[in-house]
Amino acid sequence: RSTQSRSSAASDVYKRQSLFDPQEVESERTVIISEREGSENEPLFRLDEAMQMAAFEKHPYRYEVIGLKEDLLRIQRDDLYQHYRTYYAPNNAIVTVAGDFQTKEMLAQLREIYGDLKPSSLPEVHIESEPPLSKERHVEISGPGETTYLRVVYRAPAANHSDFFAFTVLDSILSGPASLNMFGGGGISNKTSRLYRALVETELAVSVYGGLQATVDPFLYPITITIHPRQTAEAALSVLDREIQRLQQEAVPEAEIQRAIKQARALFAYGSENITNQAFWLGYAEIFASYDWLIHYVQELEKVTPTDIQRIAQTYLQPPRRVVGIYRPTNMLGGN
């Protein structure tokens, strides 16, 4: 009964009967703008937004998910309603079901709930491909606070690219295992990673983490470093470059690769251990590749070799393919 109730609620959305009351639209606009303004007080949000703008010139990945403030102010109720009427349609949706159920009965239930919904006439969407970065770009932000941050982002492959799995293992070796999306796991330390040992244990940094994401189109591989109060971003960048050069020039020992695979595999297991996350990942994988991507994820990680890691480092982790960003704290109330 719970499944049917939730499915019925979801079908109400796709019946396209929501009214988008103008007063409710204005109320939500206020909430979202307030959320954005709160994020603008966070140094890493400001730095990340500026770096995405620098990394992409044409692709929508140029923009943060929450959008630009000027767009939030400009968008009208009719714009939202038309988007809803066009895209919230059964021919633009994927239903995923995870849990204890009988397949035949579940399919009948889904047909009963969704079967009468009318498809929408979907416009052809053309997303302009982003040209490769050919020169290192730099972003520097200053503002209130006491902490310096260094963030370096490299162009990374899409989730359905054959290099993605080797890149995932490289990330685990370099900065520690990281969640592929918001439905990630936890409890896996990155203290055995190369950058933790090179930066945190030497007190050049307070923390370091990476974060390869599973995306539809090629996105970014960010490495974020919180600089130690007595150190500089430039010193940390030099050490980062040294560790990347090691990956490019020296084969990673097999034992280190197996440990990294084990950590990445464990994090993925934590992130998909409950049925909500399983349903999310099945649907999400179907969007950017197919659900087989999820089914074979662990097996693909286990195929990665030292040669693969070296090739990924040589191909993707090059200075011309990156944006270097620094947030420098000041005593000012505002920033540049």
Residue ranges and their predicted role:
Residues 292-295:
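C-terminal soluble interaction/assembly domains
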